[in-house]
């Protein structure tokens, strides 16, 4: 049985409007914006020492065809203790 992840590293979410989404996460959850790139991305965290726990990525008119209109979860990244743990999980 593979070892469990240590913790959730971050989530990446596709949004239609990064400015509005950033404001929502700041107002509702009190997240800190670590880095903001208008019209493209916001990297946010509950902990000001972290670079990001939530990454908001705007899908604009120039998004690849397979991504147009596909707002929502893009990926989650989990922290594991070692590369061997990752390999075990992959094989499972």
Predicted regions and their residues:
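Generic hydrophobic, aliphatic-rich segments that mediate packing or membrane embedding
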Residues: 69-72, 89
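Vicinal oxygen chelate
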Residues: 15-20, 77-92
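N-terminal beta-strand motif that seeds the catalytic metal site of vicinal oxygen chelate
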Residues: 1-19, 73-76
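Conserved short beta-strand elements that form part of the metal-binding/catalytic scaffold
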Residues: 32-70, 80
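Conserved active-site tyrosine of GNAT-family acetyltransferases
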Residues: 21-26
